[in-house]
Amino acid sequence: NVAQAYAYEMYVGGFWCHQNPNNGESVNERLSKVGFPFTTVGENLAIASTVRSGHQSLMQSDSHRNTILDNEFRRVGIGVVSGPIGLIIVQVFS
């Protein structure tokens, strides 16, 4: 799962951003690398104490909510990793 792998990568690498600062990969490149077909892609990231609070936080942000509700997306992958600062949550939409 691309979302789970990226959540873990951020946890181990000690970063939290859409583009991996160590290798420059974007969500598009991560999907392409595993051969996942897509035309449109979106990614949401959150750090929260629970999955519910992370989702609520994303839904309160206009841009993140728009990604979640975008009817062009037909698939979603979700990754969650628990660390010392809480849960790292990654949502990948295509």
Where are the regions that the model predicts?
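Functional surface patches built around histidine and acidic residues
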Residues: N1-S94
